[in-house]
A protein has these predicted regions:
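Short, contiguous, well-ordered secondary-structure segments
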Residues: 1-2, 56
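General helical secondary-structure elements
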Residues: 2, 35-36, 47, 108
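N-terminal single-pass transmembrane signal-anchor helix
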Residues: 4-35
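Broad hydrophobic/π-residue packing in well-ordered secondary structure
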Residues: 8, 31, 57-60, 142
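Short, low-complexity cationic-aromatic patches
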Residues: 24-30, 53, 80, 133
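Membrane-proximal N-terminal amphipathic helix
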Residues: 36-65
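Periplasmic/extracellular, small/polar-rich flexible segments of pilin-like filament-forming proteins
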Residues: 59-165
């Protein structure tokens, strides 16, 4: 009888394992790059959404289009924000509204997307990427600051100011 070999040799199995390892390593690097880009793009989009939302409120009040806004205060309760707007008073309202609208920090570093002063310390600037920080230098000015990581994982920031007319 001639014996027929069934199965693979050790060398063949090692080659297959090596190929799978190389593909996995390449895939992980590509996946990390993709997720980092998605976090960065989502963070920039979130910053712009908060800015445009407040700009719309300011413009609507200034133009006499509306006298008040209904913002979410919880999953079931609404908060009425009246014109004229006050930047100091509106920060808390915006925090809750965006939280209950389902907006989240893409980096997961803070419990909410919009937070008053989430970059006040050096530690926060280094670790709270993705948070849209709202501050009010005065009653007529709302300042938005957001930190994110660029493609080289360096910290970058966006800063915008909305002025109440």
């Amino acid at each position: 009888y001639g014996m027929k070999q069934k199965g693979f040799s050790l060398i063949e199995l090692l080659v297959v394992v090596a190929i799978i390892g190389i593909l996995a390593a390449v895939g992980i690097v590509a996946y990390n790059g993709y997720t980092n880009a998605a976090k960065r793009n989502t963070t920039i989009s979130n910053h712009n959404t908060v800015k445009k939302f407040y700009q719309l409120m300011v413009t609507s009040c200034a133009g006499g289009i509306v006298e008040k806004f209904e913002l979410k205060r919880s999953s079931t309760a609404k908060e009425i924000v009246y014109c004229p707007l006050n930047a100091h008073a509106n920060i808390n309202s915006l925090e809750y509204h965006f939280m209950y609208e389902g907006f989240a920090n893409a980096y997961g570093t803070t419990p909410r997307l919009v937070i008053k002063g989430c970059y006040e310390t050096a530690w926060q600037k280094k670790n709270n990427h993705g948070c849209v920080s709202l501050t009010a230098p005065d009653d007529k000015t709302l300042k938005l600051t957001t930190y994110y990581l660029d493609q080289d994982k360096n910290s970058q920031s966006l800063t915008d100011t909305v002025t109440i007319e």
